[in-house]
């Protein structure tokens, strides 16, 4: 039950939690807390529907949201965890994501057909991921927060913020004052609490340097019309496409890539290292056109494309904070810091933070005890998530200079994400069997390699850091890219938990496209599960103290039946 001080019990302007911002993190936190019968106020300076990015889901994001939905009884969060449920329950504007596609380019040259990698998202057990049309998804989650009891003030400007060990308060431009027991800042780069408490680090500590220009477009051709791999099961157009080149990358996120879509738009975003491509005063459209002129295969995809809204053109994307937790307040992940959209890790790391913070904040509210040590883990978690993502992305920007280095280093991402998924699925399987929240709290029980894709496996931690050292040697000019790439491949081959991951058809390359040999992913999934039960090393088997094949098929059948009954 909610505990309130007697003086504030009947004050309509007093809340247990005040949330600044109504994006996905704010509304998810609001829904969780309101479902637990706490009084929650969400304050939003703008209003819904609205344009924002962060449009591509990944399996770890969906697994984490599935856990949160099950733990706190919020089906709306479960609805955004697969393409099928998002398209059915949330918005027909949703695009489908069956793969991560990475295509390498060199200035002035047509794309070399062998220089690509593609990672397939399996059909089993929950189906493909989603391209979120955020204005619809965010509005859906806001409605869910309101449904569970959140009070929402949109188009509300806050002029004063207060937070100390005794409580929190905000004052609006209209002169209203709201008080609370805790405050969560989901305000992104312009987070007001970061400004008030002077939390931003100058200079930013992150190694990654990138700026961005992005918009939504009509008339973007499927890249399959320009480049098609013989025998390739999943089209580039059915996934999130990354065009890579020295000094940056371009995302292409189609919402119009399946027959049921009611959305003709494609999200397009160009990331550039400002040390290679300094920002100038020319318009974003002119800069984009000049970029397309340098890369003919990309230019062909955009020959007939037109933006439907003004371009957003940024300065350096990266920012960092020296702290994200203080007296009765917390900055959510993207209010604390940001790296880069590469690998779509922002939403996943936000979901990880939500899960960890919600459990701790609910206990603090019930105990009426907000002592800093209760939230110390959140501080370390967020900073480690950002730092490790920075390590990954900064190495990738180095690897964009040579396809051989990219092909080698990106395998650390592929292996890490699969292992991380094993860890999440195991925790959820235990919880589904026991309904004991301790089985989920174990995820945040201070794992030894906090922030890493697989936070409790020493072998992966060592592999990643060995590979990172090779890429950083290239960046520093101490080693040629081909030599570092060969060494990274050797490091992977030496690990019996890593090398077999590339034999199940989920990760294909230009020289081995035949590995993607099962359109519906049943055979690769069963082969993978069989390996985990038989020949996998102990560090992998530890994630399978349940029957994974039974759980896999049960989840698949349950999901399909549930969707069929809603037709």
UniProtKB/Swiss-Prot annotation:
Listed SUPFAM superfamilies: FAD/NAD(P)-binding domain
Metabolic or biological pathway, per its Swiss-Prot or TrEMBL entry: Antibiotic biosynthesis
Phenotype upon gene inactivation: Cells lacking this gene lose the ability to produce pyrrolnitrin and accumulate MDA.
GO BP term, example: antibiotic biosynthetic process
Described function: Involved in the biosynthesis of the antifungal antibiotic pyrrolnitrin. Catalyzes the chlorination of monodechloroaminopyrrolnitrin (MDA) at the 3 position to form aminopyrrolnitrin (APRN).
Keywords: Antibiotic biosynthesis, Monooxygenase, Oxidoreductase
Keyword Manganese in annotation: no
Record-linked InterPro entries: FAD/NAD-bd_sf (IPR036188), Flavin-dep_Halogenase_NPB (IPR050816), Flavin_halogenase (IPR006905)
Protein name: Monodechloroaminopyrrolnitrin halogenase PrnC
EC number: 1.14.14.-
The UniProt record lists the keyword S-adenosyl-L-methionine: no
């Amino acid at each position: 039950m909610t505990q309130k001080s007697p003086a504030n019990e009947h004050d309509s302007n007093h809340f247990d939690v005040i949330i600044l911002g109504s994006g996905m993190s704010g509304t998810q936190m609001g829904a969780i807390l309101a479902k637990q019968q706490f009084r929650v106020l969400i304050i939003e300076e703008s209003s819904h529907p609205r344009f924002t990015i962060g449009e591509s889901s990944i399996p770890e994001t969906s697994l984490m949201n599935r856990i949160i939905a099950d733990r706190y009884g919020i089906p709306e969060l479960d609805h955004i965890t697969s393409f099928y449920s998002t398209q059915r329950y949330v918005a027909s504007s949703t695009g489908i994501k069956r793969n991560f596609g990475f295509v390498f380019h060199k200035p002035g040259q047509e794309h070399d057909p062998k220089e690509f990698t593609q990672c397939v998202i399996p059909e089993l057990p929950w189906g493909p991921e989603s391209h979120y049309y955020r204005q619809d998804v965010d509005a859906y989650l806001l409605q869910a927060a309101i449904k569970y009891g959140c009070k929402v003030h949109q188009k509300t400007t806050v002029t004063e913020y207060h937070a100390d060990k005794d409580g929190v308060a905000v004052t609006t431009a209209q002169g209203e004052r709201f008080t609370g027991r805790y405050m969560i800042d989901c305000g992104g780069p312009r987070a007001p609490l970061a400004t008030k408490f002077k939390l931003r680090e100058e200079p930013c500590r992150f190694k990654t340097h990138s700026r961005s220009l992005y918009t939504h477009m009509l008339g973007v051709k499927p890249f399959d019309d320009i480049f098609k791999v013989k025998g390739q099961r999943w089209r580039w157009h059915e996934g999130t496409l990354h065009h890579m080149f020295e000094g940056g990358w371009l995302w292409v996120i189609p919402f119009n890539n399946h027959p049921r879509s009611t959305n003709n738009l494609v999200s397009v975003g160009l990331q550039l290292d400002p040390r290679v491509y300094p920002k100038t005063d020319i318009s974003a459209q002119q800069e984009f056109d000049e970029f397309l002129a340098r890369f003919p295969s990309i230019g062909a995809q955009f020959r007939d494309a037109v933006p439907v809204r003004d371009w957003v053109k940024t300065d350096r994307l990266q920012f960092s904070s020296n702290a994200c937790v203080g007296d009765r307040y917390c900055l959510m992940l993207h209010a604390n810091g940001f790296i880069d959209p590469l690998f779509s890790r922002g939403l996943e790391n936000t979901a990880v933070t939500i899960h960890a913070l919600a459990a701790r904040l609910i206990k603090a509210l019930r105990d009426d005890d907000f002592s800093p040590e209760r939230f110390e883990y959140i501080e370390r978690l967020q900073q480690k998530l950002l730092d490790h993502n920075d390590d990954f992305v900064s190495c990738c920007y180095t690897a964009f200079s040579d396809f051989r280095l990219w092909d080698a280093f990106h395998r650390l991402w592929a292996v890490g994400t699969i292992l991380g998924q094993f860890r999440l699925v195991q925790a959820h399987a235990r919880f589904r069997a026991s309904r004991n929240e301790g089985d989920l709290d174990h995820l945040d029980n201070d794992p030894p390699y906090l922030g890493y894709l697989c936070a409790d496996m020493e072998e992966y931690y060592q592999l990643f850091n060995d590979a990172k050292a090779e890429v950083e040697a290239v960046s520093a000019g101490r080693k040629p890219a081909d030599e570092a790439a060969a060494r990274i491949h050797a490091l992977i081959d030496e690990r019996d938990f890593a090398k077999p991951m590339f034999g199940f058809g989920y990760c294909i390359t230009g020289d081995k496209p035949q590995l993607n040999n099962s359109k519906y992913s049943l055979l690769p999934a069963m082969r993978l599960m069989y390996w985990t039960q038989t020949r996998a090393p102990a560090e992998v088997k530890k994630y399978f103290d349940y029957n994974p094949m039974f759980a896999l098929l049960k989840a698949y059948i349950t999901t399909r039946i549930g969707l069929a009954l809603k037709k």
